[in-house]
């Protein structure tokens, strides 16, 4: 049996991610290029120890998604180990720079963005390089 819903498509999507308790906030739902800041996608922190897959074409936000997850896990006190061959995530060690684009994005998505640095330890798979050698 199907029922008609007066909720917007973004709200219908967000309803599937409506969780209580500690959760990671992945952000606002975007439908056809329109952001609904009241429709938030969340993952319960207790389920983050399970397997997951983040897939997509180049430029679709996979690395940014991993960064957001790592930042929120760090904030929650959960240690994170990430392999970053291309060096895309090394910026986690420094607070981001606020600018008009980040301010507008935070407004559009309903986020309260504050530049934050996170604890980072760099490891290296050899004896050369900047990181602590692993072997």
Question: Which functions belong to the PLM regions below?
Answer:
Residues 1-57, 64-76, 80-81, 86-125:
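Basic- and hydrophobic-enriched, low-structure N-terminal and domain-boundary segments
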């Amino acid at each position: 049996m199907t029922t008609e819903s007066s909720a917007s498509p973004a709200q219908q999507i967000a309803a599937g991610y409506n969780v209580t308790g500690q959760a990671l906030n992945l952000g606002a739902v975007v439908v056809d290029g329109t952001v609904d800041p009241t429709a938030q996608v969340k993952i319960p922190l207790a389920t983050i120890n399970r397997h997951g897959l983040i897939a997509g074409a180049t430029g679709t936000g996979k690395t940014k998604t991993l960064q957001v997850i790592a930042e929120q896990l760090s904030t929650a006190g959960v240690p994170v180990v990430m392999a970053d061959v291309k060096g895309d995530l090394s910026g986690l060690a420094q607070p981001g720079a606020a600018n008009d684009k980040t301010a507008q994005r935070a407004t559009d998505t309903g986020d309260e963005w504050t530049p934050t640095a996170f604890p980072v330890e760099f490891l290296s798979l050899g004896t050369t390089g900047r990181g602590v050698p692993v072997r």
